[in-house]
Amino acid sequence: MEQKYNPAAVEQKWQQQWETGASFAVNEQSDRPKYYLLEMFPYPSGRIHMGHVRNYSIGDVIGRFKRMRGFNVLHPMGWDAFGMPAENAAIQNKSHPAKWTYENIDYMRGQLKKMGLSYDWGRELATCDLEYYRWEQKIFLEMFAKGLAYKKTSYVNWCPTCETVLANEQVEDGACWRCDSPVQQKELDQWFFRITQYAEELLSYTEKLPGWPERVLVMQKNWIGKSHGCEVDFPLEGGTGSVRVFTTRPDTLFGATFMSLAPEHPQARELTTPDRRDEVERFIEKVRNTDRSKRTADDYEKEGVFTGSYCINPLTQVRMPIYLANFVLTDYGTGAVMAVPTHDQRDFEFAKKYGLDLKVVIQPEGTTLDPATMEAAYTEPGIMVNSGTFDGMGSEEAKQAIADHLQEMGGGTKTVTYRLRDWGISRQRYWGNPIPVIYCDCCGVVPVPEKDLPVRLPMDVEFTGEGGSPLARLESFINVPCPTCGKPARRETDTMDTFVQSSWYFLRYCCPDFHDAPLDRTRVDYWMSVDQYIGGIEHAVLHLLYARFFTKVLRDLGYVECSEPFTNLLTQGMVIKDGAKMSKSKGNVVDPNALIERYGADTARLFSLFAAPPEKDLDWNDQGVDGSFRFLNRVWKLVNDRLELISGAAPLDVPGLTGEERTLRRAVHKTIRKVTEDIEGRFHFNTAIAAVMELLNVLQSADLSTPQAGAVMKEALESLVLLLAPFVPHMAEELWQRMGQPGALSTTPWPEYDREAAVDDEVLMVVQVNGKLRSKITVAAGSDEESLKALALADDKVQPFLQGVQVRKVICVKGKLVNIVVG
């Protein structure tokens, strides 16, 4: 029998056994409670990185632990396989995206299997599989029928490098989230999902997710951005219509002196007088190519242009010039802002720059503001002035009063708006899910009939690197008869945003072999919601919000019962090295393959779990990896060295244990308690592993000559191996087998700690006099209060502080301290 730890041999052996025996396959016919565990599935980029190793190791510990705790654990894996990198690789390498993607999947699957992850590989899916995206097309058609999918012309975020549209959430600091190119504004016909219809439910249900990090919930609430206010109509001079604004500050309406429109506002050009047209067009073009995030930044220079038109303040009847302003966006409110320069800093800076009127309508109590001497806008609450019948009223009270007045006079309506905008899903790329729509000159927009699904992504596509989608140049794909009238028609050539696929994959895992509909309601309702979801904080708004939206839509379409997809969410930290996130450009990447080849998967897993709590960044260091490997070698040697001792051990006689044996057993059961609590309640894997390391030290120095040394050591080593099983499953399985234990560890129950054994015989207690530490005493565990008081009062170190004073009170906190109050 191999005595030296050989991770390669051990890991290969057990990976083969797990695969052959389908050890982690599950179904719904179980009397165990279900537990659905999921890590965010990866994009098949070619190979896994250390972030994957950490993420999937975290999930695997939870899955193996829950399995040993008696749960029916669903732990699937798949591939978020559509997307631009495959298409770009096709252009660069002259390889079809499908070939590139599936080769990467095969390679990465092998890498994940080498990590010993407990996935039910029978449920594996790839979003580029026809059997997956066909059902997504059906869901699209059902959303279209319900008015949840629609097409409109709008300004969109355009990445000139990727040559495709980006959702607002995919623009980071004015750049494309994938390639970092500056994003431009472009007007296109686009397909949208009506996520705004679910804005209030998405917001209110954040209160029903106590298992989510507060940071993520705050980010989602802010992105949804609910605001209470008024929509107010400002009539155009000359009686030719009006400009509608949304404001959360109706109390400032008497101070509105000009109007600011977003350059993209639909009325911008029609309000421009002929003499202003050239200047306005130049301004619109300039702003269109400006980073949107810069436009709203506090330190960005406020610029604008006068349109030549005026509107009328409905309360003051003052004539207000209408400007286009670079800091106003169309995707908040109505895209028009009533400018109140004395009470809004951006308006103040703009008015000062262009010489526009300032009028104070809110004063701080006891102070008079003079517009001529103001150096900044006054934005705090105060007392109303220059506001007609509302003068003297508090500004907070005036918000409601003026809103009511506007509504009564027909000049405005109290309303609620959201920052959230509908989700633009059109992408001008090939490697994605075709949008199942046909355009007919006679019939208009015609959904592809369900009997004609799926719309297959054609394989005979040429990748030239030219702009736009290759599908738009493929006549055999484009030209089709209209399903309604039979006349020549054209297919939609846009594909869906890849975030659509990741918005429901967790549901399809529940029934990947179901061929009659997108989802099998019975099986989905058994498994959903996901009990524990694991992924990066960078998905807080994008993927997680879309997944919540899709779950609610599918609930309303009758496919699922649940309203929220993920009960608990863990956002793990990054893996960093030399103070920076690992990346090829920084030259600080650690190759998991090389790591596993040298040390084994168990060592890689152990270090990634031990070096930091899951939610914190992990700072990579080679010494830590060496330390983890040495620890596993010590475990291996200890168990193998003690096999003979424990093999012939008599059953454990607890009442007959010696004091030394009892101490050793106490260490074992305290460790079981500690590791159980750390994994189950807090996912503090680092402190759980540290506790096992401490136990190993105790076991290595244990006296083997005591009467029941073999029996105590047998229980201790069995517990040690079981506690390590979720972290280092290959070694644990091998040692378990060598110890002569029947069955696999995956079906072996987690050890239960003996409450009596885990309690210390003696405890160290602090003794204070008037709150100051004066001594420490060792007492028998479970001593009653009177005994503790007597021991404290009699202690030699305490006695000098009791001379010549009266003991007024003795406060006892069992197991911790005794405080003697004197005076």
UniProtKB/Swiss-Prot annotation:
The protein's Enzyme Commission number: 6.1.1.4
CDD domains tied to this protein: Anticodon_Ia_Leu_BEm, LeuRS_core
Motif ('HIGH' region): 42-52
GO cellular component: cytosol
Entry binding sites for ATP: K584
Top EC class, one word: ligase
Subcellular localization(s) per the UniProt record: Cytoplasm
Annotated motif 'KMSKS' region, positions: 581-585
GO molecular function per UniProt: aminoacyl-tRNA deacylase activity; ATP binding; leucine-tRNA ligase activity
PROSITE patterns linked to this entry: AA_TRNA_LIGASE_I (PS00178)
Location, primary (coarse class): cytoplasm
SUPFAM superfamilies the record matches: Anticodon-binding domain of a subclass of class I aminoacyl-tRNA synthetases (SSF47323), Nucleotidylyl transferase (SSF52374), ValRS/IleRS/LeuRS editing domain (SSF50677)
Catalytic activity: tRNA(Leu) + L-leucine + ATP = L-leucyl-tRNA(Leu) + AMP + diphosphate
Keywords: Aminoacyl-tRNA synthetase, ATP-binding, Cytoplasm, Ligase, Nucleotide-binding, Protein biosynthesis
Keyword presence, ATP-binding: yes
Xref: HAMAP family: Leu_tRNA_synth_B
Similarity annotation: Belongs to the class-I aminoacyl-tRNA synthetase family.
Stored NCBIfam families: leuS_bact
Name by which UniProt lists this protein: Leucine--tRNA ligase
Gene source species: Pelobacter propionicus (strain DSM 2379 / NBRC 103807 / OttBd1)
Lineage, highest ranks first: Bacteria, Pseudomonadati, Thermodesulfobacteriota, Desulfuromonadia, Desulfuromonadales
